[in-house]
Structure formats: structure tokens, C-alpha cells
Amino acid sequence: MNYLNETIDSLNDKLKSGAVSADQLAKDTIANIKKTDEKINAFITVDEDAKPAEDLDFNNKLAGVPIAIKDNIITNGLKTTAASHILYNFEPVYESTVVAKLKAAQATIIGKTNMDEFAMGSSTETSYFGDTKNPWNLNKVPGGSSGGSAAAVASGEVVAALGSDTGGSIRQPASFNGIFGIKPTYGRVSRWGLIAFASSLDQIGVMSKRVKDSAEVLNVIAGADDRDATVSEKEVPDYTSFLDKDVKGLRVAVPKEYMSDAVEEGVRKAVEAQIELLRANGAIINEVSLPHTKYVVPTYYIIASSEASANLERYDGIRYGYRAEAKNLDEVFLKSRSEGFGDEVKRRIMLGSFALSAGAYDKFFLQAAKVRTLICQDFDKIFEDNDVIVGPVSTETAFDLNSEISDQIKMYNNDILTISANMAGIPAASVPAGLSETTGMPVGFQIMAKRFDEGHVFQVADFIERSNKFYEQTPAGLED
Ligand SMILES: NC(=O)C[C@H](N)C(=O)O
């Protein structure tokens, strides 16, 4: 079964009418993943025994629908590695809240997708389990860190997948693969069972080819959870109620810093075309400024690495995961961590430990925390007179495999347009804007809104999807 021309609604119809059984759907999905993954390596683990829930109730839109999960989200009894050697054999004995909610809605969990190790990266090239390839061009990266989820959706292996986004990890791969991806408001979706990278920034979200599919999955996974005190008790609206609307009178802010010369021409043109589309349909376009944009990359990498250095202390070779051969206890810690973590993870642990150390704390961590407040204030100010902020997701389209991974500064700078939404905790999405005239690869259009205003994000994304119909295009890299 390939999902390129399916939606959750079309699958629900087929299952309801008996045109296909949920058992058969799971089997066909696994067979297709195995075939497609020979080319793209989107999955770390496929659950060969995946079975639909019993007594399916097709009033649940997700009943019997196979869904893929990023491999940093805990799945009870199904290997969860965060794409790291240090967790290469880790089989959790509990369930993450999002997966428990998907199972309660009777979705079939089909497997775990590839990613950058512990979500640290923007190309899925830091995975211990090999690179994922971009279905639009197999010589290009799928982006990251949720590159496996994005490639799985873009190639039609699944209709929807969960990802996580700390500094752009859902939106950037969604943009590189020509699909939709949404990072909800910080506190909208429980992080219980998400393997922590930077706890004040991490958020679980959804990736799918079509906007409505993500709205339907978010309906299921959002909402309060006793196990995560950072999740809001706010009622979860029906996100599909924001679809099929026009954009007349909508106040749309375009930050001038997001349309600078640093943005590749093909990306800028595709993004400008969507802005013109909104204008032509009655939206009010306002040029605005996010003056602290030039500080977001260093601020993010100090905060995220500091939190990571503390969160990753738990991997000690004793309790779970990889344990190196050693002569004494000190050596167990030292060798397990040295051999278990990859270079990028070690780099961030060292950077973060330094930023938190006695002599450096005030100058780095504290300073970064203060700048973060200024970044948040930039957004609050714009949202006083605007409903959404739009612009590109990334300064470029998917780049060649092995072309940027050894240049950390370049890799980090690539995140400049996505990181701020995490620092401000606001919802943000990427919706396809077409193919770049210069590279022929997909371009993503970013939409951000106030905290807990996913509604406006869905409204604009759905409007753009209906207008440019990018979903009619199929990824060229998979043709034989
Ligand atoms: N995790 C993310 O959201 C991706 C970001 N590029 C990082 O490496 O931190």
C-alpha cells in the first residue's frame, strides 16, 4: 500500500466500507515500506507484528490507520533508539502519552523513523543507523532531525507520522520533502515519553502530506496530561474546524529579516508567490521586523546544548542501552559514553557543560536566557496587530548528502528561521510553496501564530494547499 494519493478520510472510507481490512492494510503497508526503504532508509524499526486494535470503531478517524513514530518517542515493547548507539537495543517498558493516545484512537503503530542522533542535526546524517535519502532526489538530505518521518510521508510509506521539533526539526524536513508539518505551541502536546533533548524547547508535532490529516492527528494527541506539568489544561478545539476558510481581512506579518539576501533566490520567489496569493485574496500584508533575529542561532545553541548536557547525563552504561567492556566503574561510564555517543552529541554536551560551568554561566547561559526574553517580546509585539507571521522555513532547499555535515557553523546557521518559534513557544508550520526555480527541490512556507492559536496556522496552510495544490506532484527520486 502506498499512500501518495490517500488521506486519513479516504482510508477511513475504505475501512468502513470493507474495501480493505485493517489487517490487510497493516500488512500491505509493511510490504511497501520494506520495498521503498531499500532506497530511502526512512525507518530504523518496522514493527513486523503490527496489528490493528480489536473491535475497530470507524467513528475514530484513525481506527486501523498505520502511523509512523519518530524514534525518540517511547513505544512500549518496541525498540526506541533516538538514532543513537547508546540506545541501540533499548526496549521501553512504558508508553509515551502521544502513543497511548494514538492507540486509544485505535491507530496502528507501524514503526519508528530515522532521525539525527538525539534530534541534534538538520540532515539526519548524525544517525547511528545510516542516512535517510530525500525522495525527491536520492542524492540529497531529507533535512532533520525528523528526516525519517518526513521522507516516510513524502514517499507514501505512511499517511502521517509524528516528529519532534526543538529548533525546526519538524518544519525544516517538512519543507525539504514537500509535505506539511506542524510544531504546536509549547505545552499543547504532552512530552511524557519524548526522549528529552532541550526540555524548554522540545515539542511533539505531526507531519503529513495533507493539512487536514495533521489536524486530525493533532486532535488526538493534544491536551492535558497528569504526567507532564508543562502541558496546558486549555480545551483542545477541533482543528479541522479551521479549514475551508478564506483569508479575507487576515493580518499577515512578513519580517524583513526573513526575506534577506541570505535566502536563496528560488526559495524567496516561491515564498513571495504565496504572500502575493494571500494578498490577492484579501489578506492585509504588513512588513515587520524581528530585530533580534541575528542573535537567535548563538542563543539557541547555548540554551539547547546546556539543557542537553544535563538531560543526557542519564546515559551511563549502567541502567539501559549500550555498555562498553570495562575494568572498573569509572571506565564503564567513560567508555560507554565515549563509544555510545556520536560526534555531534559529544560536541553539544561539551558546549553545554561549558556554558553552565561556574566561570562561564553568567556570560553564556544567563545572557542567552535574557536574549531569549527579548526574542519572545519581538513576537508579542508583532502579534498585537497581526494574526500570523509568514516567511521561508529554511534559507535553502535540500542540500547534497555529505556536503555540509562537516561545517557546523553552516549547519547551525541554517536554523536561523525556525529556532525563534521554539524560543517563543509559539505554534509554527511548514506548508509546501512549490519547487525552487533554481534547484528544482521543494520549498516550505512558514506560518507562525500566537501561543495556542494553531487555528490560524491551519487556516492559512489549508488555504495555500487548496490554492497551489502542490500535493498533486509526486517525488521524482522514487521513479525507477
Ligand atoms: N532538533 C532540532 O530541532 C534541530 C536543530 N537543527 C538542532 O540541531 O538542534
Swiss-Prot record:
Record keywords: ATP-binding, Ligase, Nucleotide-binding, Protein biosynthesis
Enzymatic reactions: L-glutamyl-tRNA(Gln) + L-glutamine + ATP + H2O = L-glutaminyl-tRNA(Gln) + L-glutamate + ADP + phosphate + H(+)
Active-site residue list: K70, S145, S169
GO MF term set: ATP binding; glutaminyl-tRNA synthase (glutamine-hydrolyzing) activity
Gene Ontology terms: cellular component: glutamyl-tRNA(Gln) amidotransferase complex
Protein task: Allows the formation of correctly charged Gln-tRNA(Gln) through the transamidation of misacylated Glu-tRNA(Gln) in organisms which lack glutaminyl-tRNA synthetase. The reaction takes place in the presence of glutamine and ATP through an activated gamma-phospho-Glu-tRNA(Gln).
The protein's name in its UniProt record: Glutamyl-tRNA(Gln) amidotransferase subunit A
Gene from which this protein is expressed: gatA
